[in-house]
Structures are given as C-alpha cells and as structure tokens.
Swiss-Prot record:
Disulfide bonds join 31-59, 38-52, 42-60. PANTHER family: BETA-DEFENSIN, DEFENSIN BETA 4A. Has antibacterial activity. It is found in: Secreted. GO terms for molecular function: CCR6 chemokine receptor binding; chemoattractant activity; phosphatidylinositol-4,5-bisphosphate binding. This is Beta-defensin 5. Its main location: secreted. It comes from Rattus norvegicus. Residues 1-22 form the signal peptide. The lineage of its organism: Eukaryota, Metazoa, Chordata, Craniata, Vertebrata.
Length: 63
C-alpha cells in the first residue's frame, strides 16, 4: 500500500512542471516574462504564444 503513495508523489513531482506550459499568456507582463513582445500582428519570423489582454494585440515570440 505504501508503494501507491510513493508512485503518486513521484507522478506529482514528474508532471508538475507541465502545468507551466499549459497556462495561457493573457497580459503584457506575462508576455514579456516568457520572452515575447506585444504586437498587433506577428511578423514572419515570430509566432504567437498568447495575447496581451486586448482584443487584437498578440504576444509574439521569435521562432
């Protein structure tokens, strides 16, 4: 029965960093924190990683 607790804690520690990547970027501060810039439309060498909280302003990061 103790192996279940060990397995659960191991999976919790192993999968917890993945929650960082699933959080949405929806404000300018988190955009800059993740290495992006707030731009109206992402230029060719950039990709969209979120929004900057306003309607059509996107958070773009270099590919």
């Amino acid at each position: 029965m103790r192996i279940h607790y060990l397995l659960f804690s191991f999976l919790l520690v192993l999968l917890s960093p993945l929650s960082v990547f699933t959080q949405s970027i929806n404000n300018p501060v988190s955009c800059v924190t993740h290495g992006g810039i707030c731009w109206g439309r992402c230029p060719g060498s950039f990709r969209q990683i979120g929004t900057c909280g306003l309607g059509k302003v996107r958070c773009c990061k270099k590919k």
